[in-house]
């Protein structure tokens, strides 16, 4: 790889890392190409970027984008995106289904996070699920009131 190619890779990573709310670093050693393609497809559906990069290049891009503190060793695959829940869910779900895939560390909301935090975020409901729950709570009193009025109307009609 030439120096200009490395500079280009660093620039693309830096741009992606700056725009991201979450970066998850995982070990992928031993995964087949088919499994990696499955991970990429899942990530693409959730607007999550996935890339395997040399640690030295990733470290430079992370430091340039202000995401410091991650210790990068061995083989790593990087997942990042604007939605921290989406990134966490993709990584945690894939780890559940694949023994050879392991979440190592993460950088979420400006600070280094451990595996437990990533898994905790993955269990949280998404924004759309939370909005649906909120709408259910708001609609419940109106629905119950309407049911009560209909029951009263039916009772009056039957008399």
UniProtKB/Swiss-Prot annotation:
InterPro entries reported in the protein's UniProt record = Ribosomal_uL10, Ribosomal_uL10-like_sf, Ribosomal_uL10_bac, Ribosomal_uL10_bac_type, Ribosomal_uL10_CS_bac
Give a yes or no for keyword Ribonucleoprotein in this entry.
yes
Gene name in the database record: rplJ
Originating species: Campylobacter jejuni (strain RM1221)
The function of this protein is: Forms part of the ribosomal stalk, playing a central role in the interaction of the ribosome with GTP-bound translation factors.
Fill in the subunit field for this protein. Answer: Part of the ribosomal stalk of the 50S ribosomal subunit. The N-terminus interacts with L11 and the large rRNA to form the base of the stalk. The C-terminus forms an elongated spine to which L12 dimers bind in a sequential fashion forming a multimeric L10(L12)X complex.
Q: What is this protein called?
A: Large ribosomal subunit protein uL10
The record's similarity note reads: Belongs to the universal ribosomal protein uL10 family.
Name the keywords, alphabetized: Ribonucleoprotein, Ribosomal protein, RNA-binding, rRNA-binding
Q: Which NCBIfam families match?
A: PRK00099.1-1
The Gene Ontology biological process terms listed for this entry are: translation
One family name in Pfam for this protein: Ribosomal_L10
Molecular function terms, GO-annotated: large ribosomal subunit rRNA binding; structural constituent of ribosome
Q: Which domain of life is it from?
A: Bacteria
Q: Which PANTHER family match?
A: 39S RIBOSOMAL PROTEIN L10, MITOCHONDRIAL
For whether the record's keyword set contains Ribonucleoprotein, the answer is yes
- Which Gene Ontology terms of cellular component type are present? large ribosomal subunit
Task: Name the SUPFAM superfamilies for this protein.
Answer: Ribosomal protein L10-like
């Amino acid at each position: 790889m030439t120096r200009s190619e490395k500079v280009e890779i660093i620039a693309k990573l830096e741009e992606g890392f700056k725009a991201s709310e979450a970066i998850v670093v995982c070990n992928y050693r031993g995964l087949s190409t088919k499994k990696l393609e499955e991970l990429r497809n899942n990530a693409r559906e959730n607007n999550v970027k996935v890339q395997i990069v040399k640690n030295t290049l990733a470290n430079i891009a992370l430091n340039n984008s202000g995401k410091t503190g991650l210790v990068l060793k061995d083989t790593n695959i990087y997942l990042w995106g604007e939605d921290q829940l989406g990134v966490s869910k993709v990584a945690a779900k894939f780890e559940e289904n694949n023994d050879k895939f392991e979440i190592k560390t993460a950088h979420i909301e400006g600070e280094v996070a451990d595996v437990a935090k990533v898994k905790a975020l993955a269990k949280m409901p998404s924004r759309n699920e939370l909005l649906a729950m909120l709408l259910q709570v708001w609609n419940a009193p109106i629905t119950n009131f309407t049911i009560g009025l209909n029951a009263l109307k039916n009772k009056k009609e039957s008399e």
